[in-house]
C-alpha cells in the first residue's frame, strides 16, 4: 500500500518530466566536441566500425583501432590518415581476454587514456540451436558481450578518475526482440543491452556524472554478416545511415538509439500485448534470412 502511495505522489513529477521531454523534441541538441579525444574502436576493420572510424577522423579525434583482421585494419587506418587523423592500430582477438588486457596496457603506455570506447566487434552464426556448434556459441558470447566487460574494465578507471569519458555499446534490435535461428546472437545482444543499462545505472549510483553511455540497436544492416536478410519493418539498413545515426547519438549523448525508431515501439508492445496476438504480429513482421536448420538434419 505504501508503495502505491509513493507512486501516486510521483505523478506530478511524471507530468513535468513528460512535458519537458516533449518540449525537447523541438529543440536541436547541442553536439559535443571530440577533437583530440582518444577514441578506441573494436572491430574497426570492416562495416560499422570502419565507417565510425572515418567519422571520428573527420572530427580530428586520435584513433586507436582494434581488429583481428590485419588487412582490413590497415585499409581503415590508411583512409583515416588520409582524412588527417592520427591513427594507431592493434591486431586484437576480442574473444581472448588476455589479448584484450595486454593490448589495453600497450595503449595506455604508448598513447594515453582512452576517453571514448566503442565496443563494436561482433560475430553472428545464422542457425538453429541444433546446428550451432558449442565453440560458436562460446565465441558469440566472448566477442559480443564478454569483450565489453574486459575493455570497459581496462579503460573505465581512467575515465572515472578524470570524470570524463564515453562508452558506446554496439548491440542490435535483436537485443530487444527475439529472432528465431539467431539464438546465440540474440542472447548475446540481450546481454549487451543489459550490460549497457546496468553500467549506466551503476555510474549514476556512483555519481560519476562525466562518463556517458550510448547503446546502438539497429535492425538488419547490410554488412554481409547475415545473408539475404529481409523484414516488413523496412529495407535492410545501409552502414552509412546507421553510422550517421550513431555519431549523432554519441555527440548528443543519447543513451539508446533504435534504427528504425519503430523498434522502440515494438519493444514496448512486446511487454503489454497478449501472447497470442504477439505471435501473429511477429509472423506479420516476417523476419527472413539464410540459415542452417540442424533440426531437419537430425530428424532425417
From Swiss-Prot:
Keyword terms, alphabetized: Endoplasmic reticulum, Lipid biosynthesis, Lipid droplet, Lipid metabolism, NADP, Oxidoreductase, Signal, Steroid biosynthesis
Catalytic activity: 17beta-estradiol + NAD(+) = estrone + NADH + H(+); 17beta-estradiol + NADP(+) = estrone + NADPH + H(+)
KW Lipid metabolism (keyword) present: yes
SUPFAM superfamilies: NAD(P)-binding Rossmann-fold domains (SSF51735)
Active site: 185
Disulfide bonds: none
InterPro entries in the cross-refs: NAD(P)-bd_dom_sf, SDR_fam
Tissue occurrence: Present at high level in steroidogenic cells such as syncytiotrophoblasts, sebaceous gland, Leydig cells, and granulosa cells of the dominant follicle and corpus luteum. In lung, it is detected in the ciliated epithelium and in acini of adult trachea, in bronchioles, but not in alveoli. In the eye, it is detected in the nonpigmented epithelium of the ciliary body and, at lower level, in the inner nuclear layer of the retina (at protein level). Widely expressed. Highly expressed in retina, pancreas, kidney, liver, lung, adrenal, small intestine, ovary and heart.
Protein name per UniProt: Estradiol 17-beta-dehydrogenase 11
Species in which this protein is naturally found: Homo sapiens (Human)
Gene transcribed to yield this protein: HSD17B11
Amino acid at each position: 500500500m505504501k508503495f502505491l502511495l509513493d507512486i501516486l505522489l510521483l505523478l506530478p513529477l511524471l507530468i513535468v518530466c513528460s512535458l519537458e521531454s516533449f518540449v525537447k523534441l523541438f529543440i536541436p541538441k547541442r553536439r559535443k566536441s571530440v577533437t583530440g579525444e582518444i577514441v578506441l574502436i573494436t572491430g574497426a576493420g570492416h562495416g560499422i566500425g570502419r565507417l565510425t572510424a572515418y567519422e571520428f577522423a573527420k572530427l580530428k579525434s586520435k584513433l586507436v583501432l582494434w581488429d583481428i583482421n590485419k588487412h582490413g585494419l590497415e585499409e581503415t587506418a590508411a583512409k583515416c590518415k588520409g582524412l588527417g587523423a592520427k591513427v594507431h592500430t592493434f591486431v586484437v582477438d576480442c574473444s581472448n581476454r588476455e589479448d584484450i588486457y595486454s593490448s589495453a596496457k600497450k595503449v595506455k603506455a604508448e598513447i594515453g587514456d582512452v576517453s571514448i570506447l566503442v565496443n563494436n566487434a561482433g560475430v553472428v552464426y545464422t542457425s538453429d540451436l541444433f546446428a550451432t556448434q558449442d565453440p560458436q556459441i562460446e565465441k558469440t558470447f566472448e566477442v559480443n558481450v564478454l569483450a565489453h566487460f574486459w575493455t570497459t574494465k581496462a579503460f573505465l578507471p581512467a575515465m572515472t578518475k578524470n570524470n570524463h569519458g564515453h562508452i558506446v555499446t554496439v548491440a542490435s534490435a535483436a537485443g530487444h526482440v527475439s529472432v528465431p535461428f539467431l539464438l546465440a546472437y540474440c542472447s548475446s545482444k540481450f546481454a549487451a543491452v543489459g550490460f549497457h543499462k546496468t553500467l549506466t545505472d551503476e555510474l549514476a549510483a556512483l555519481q560519476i556524472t562525466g562518463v556517458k553511455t550510448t547503446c546502438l540497436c539497429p535492425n538488419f544492416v547490410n554488412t554481409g554478416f547475415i545473408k539475404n536478410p529481409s523484414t516488413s519493418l523496412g529495407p535492410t539498413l545501409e552502414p552509412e545511415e546507421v553510422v550517421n545515426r550513431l555519431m549523432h547519438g554519441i555527440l548528443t549523448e543519447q543513451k539508446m538509439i533504435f534504427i528504425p525508431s519503430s523498434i522502440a515501439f515494438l519493444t514496448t508492445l512486446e511487454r503489454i500485448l497478449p501472447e497470442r496476438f504477439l505471435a501473429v504480429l511477429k509472423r506479420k513482421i516476417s523476419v527472413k534470412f539464410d540459415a542452417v536448420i540442424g533440426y531437419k538434419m537430425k530428424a532425417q
